[in-house]
Design a protein with these regions (language model features):
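Conserved catalytic core of the tyrosine transesterase superfamily
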Residues: 1-297
């Protein structure tokens, strides 16, 4: 097996079979290139790699003081690479199969409570066209749990408001349908009927929902700044970004008793373990559950 040929085939596999984004593909190839460089240093051929060699490689990488998260991601990338070799090159074993990833302490994301969300939305000046647009943005972010990249690329042709669904393009160009609540629908209709017609829409942006004052697609940075300005306006001390609304959407659903698989589908998570981070519940809520339901409380 020649590294150059294998890497080209692996890239094609990630593009066509896994349907990954360019960013994710680059990350996988970067992991493989690290292993290739180490093999060259040790004068080991690709078909000679075994579990012991991978262990030595990981120890070598660890000497550069990389984080446990980066180590885990690297090992995950190599697992995918060797699984590909098993499929496409009939490699007999996967030398990463028996190796354990470093234990990760998942950071619980910062979320907003309902009062904070209401305060942010109430701080918007609705006397301006931009204010009405911004209110709609926050209602959709919180009401649908979108990534900011999904929000700014949202298309009018993918709004099915009569049946209360929208379609978004997520990571790896994967499409998914998401239910949308009445409040978000209400303001989307107002924005589309009363605000957007006053914007001089530029060619190529006719189908984009959220536009700037020049009629072009909003940038992710612009959405970030809108939210930062509102947080400053109400004196919100905790760190906040567009993604905070996605975290809040998921957390409030799970705390309210929503099925974790349903939340996973709405968020577009490939793995249920990613969604499980939202099963954290504040101590006051836990205490209220004990008080209400336990026979000896």
């Amino acid at each position: 097996m020649k590294w150059d040929i294998v890497k080209k085939d692996f890239k094609r596999y990630l593009q066509l079979e896994r349907n990954l984004s360019n960013h994710s593909i680059d990350a996988y190839l970067n992991d493989v290139q690290k292993l290739e460089a180490y093999c060259s240093f040790k004068k080991i051929e690709l078909n000679q790699i075994d579990t012991r060699f991978i262990q030595q490689f990981l120890i070598f990488i660890n000497d550069f003081s990389i984080s446990p998260f980066t180590q885990a991601r690297l090992l995950s990338g190599l697992r995918t690479f060797f699984a590909f070799l098993q499929i496409e090159y009939d490699k007999k074993d996967n030398p990463t199969e028996l190796l354990e990833s470093p234990r990760l302490n998942r950071k619980i994301p910062s979320v907003l409570n309902i009062e904070e969300i209401d305060a942010l939305i109430a701080a918007i000046d609705l006397s301006t066209l931009e204010g009405m647009r911004n209110k709609t943005i926050l209602e959709v972010l919180y009401g649908c749990g979108l990534r900011v990249s999904e929000l700014v690329t949202l298309k009018i042709s993918n709004l099915y408001l009569d049946v209360e669904f929208i379609k978004v393009e997520g990571k790896g160009s994967k499409e998914r349908l998401i239910p949308i609540g009445h409040q978000a629908i209400k303001y989307l209709k107002i924005y589309l009927e009363e605000v957007r017609p006053h914007i001089p829409i530029q060619a190529g942006h006719e189908d984009i929902v959220f536009l700037n004052r020049r009629g072009k697609q909003l940038t992710r940075v612009m959405v970030f700044l809108i939210i930062k300005d509102l947080a400053k306006k109400i004196g919100l001390a905790k760190p906040i970004s567009p993604h905070t609304f996605r975290h809040s959407f998921a957390s409030h659903l799970v705390e309210g008793g929503a099925d974790l698989r349903a939340v996973q589908d709405m968020l577009g998570h490939e793995s249920i373990t990613t969604t499980e981070i939202y099963t954290h519940i504040d101590k006051d809520y836990l205490q209220s559950v004990i008080t209400q339901y336990h026979p000896r409380s």
